[in-house]
UniProtKB/Swiss-Prot annotation:
Pfam families reported in the protein's UniProt record: GIY-YIG
Record InterPro entries: GIY-YIG_endonuc, GIY-YIG_endonuc_sf, UPF0213_domain
Organism superkingdom: Bacteria
Residue stretches making up the GIY-YIG domain: 5-83
Residues annotated as signal peptide: none
Protein name: UPF0213 protein lwe0147
Family (UniProt): Belongs to the UPF0213 family.
Source organism per UniProt: Listeria welshimeri serovar 6b (strain ATCC 35897 / DSM 20650 / CCUG 15529 / CIP 8149 / NCTC 11857 / SLCC 5334 / V8)
Amino acid sequence: MAKANEHFFYVLKCNDNSYYGGYTTDVTRREAEHNAGIRCKYTKTRRPVKVIHFEKFETRSEATKAEAAFKKLSRKNKDSYLIEREEDSE
């Protein structure tokens, strides 16, 4: 169950190896919705999907800015972004 006032930017890896970035207040619920084909045209035909990265933010605005910035990146830069974040978490 999500706690009040939690805001996340998340990245899914789709079955076709593409990435999808999004905003949610509950990462687990949102992953289940994507896999059920609920509320997302892009991932509906690319299931199953798996959350491979998420970041927590203090505000919705910060999380949606991170989402927008990620979506503007090229595939190569998205790969680099995810590798850097993975290394930071180790």
